[in-house]
């Protein structure tokens, strides 16, 4: 399955559970570990867990191998590793504190869900 298709499925899974501030970053020029990073926010620990679970279920149903996931216990920051696509789901305070978008080069997101797209989508 193409990276863009995996990303699209992950974003749809996040939207299904009302994830907020969903962005996709193209990390292909920054690391060889993965091609895309998707970041989303959940309003509560329970929603963060549900968002991550939704991503895992949707990707598995499409035949995508899940390499691993972490953070389900606390529900503050859950990571889902689908190989070339990595999904981070966080509480708002955790996302603000770690600001991983800035850590990955301070780049503009390649895709912001639900927002005007002043730059081209991947």
UniProtKB/Swiss-Prot annotation:
Gene3D superfamilies: Beta Polymerase, domain 2 (3.30.460.10)
InterPro entries tied to this protein: Iojap/RsfS/C7orf30, NT_sf
GO terms, molecular function: ribosomal large subunit binding
SUPFAM superfamilies for the chain: Nucleotidyltransferase (SSF81301)
Keyword set, alphabetical order: Cytoplasm, Repressor, Translation regulation
Subcellular location: Cytoplasm
Main location, first listed in the record: cytoplasm
Domain of life from the UniProt record: Bacteria
GO cellular component: cytoplasm
One of the protein's GO biological processes: negative regulation of translation
Purpose of the protein: Functions as a ribosomal silencing factor. Interacts with ribosomal protein uL14 (rplN), blocking formation of intersubunit bridge B8. Prevents association of the 30S and 50S ribosomal subunits and the formation of functional ribosomes, thus repressing translation.
HAMAP family: Iojap_RsfS
PANTHER family noted in UniProt: IOJAP SUPERFAMILY ORTHOLOG, MITOCHONDRIAL ASSEMBLY OF RIBOSOMAL LARGE SUBUNIT PROTEIN 1
Annotated family: Belongs to the Iojap/RsfS family.
Subunit organization: Interacts with ribosomal protein uL14 (rplN).
Protein name: Ribosomal silencing factor RsfS
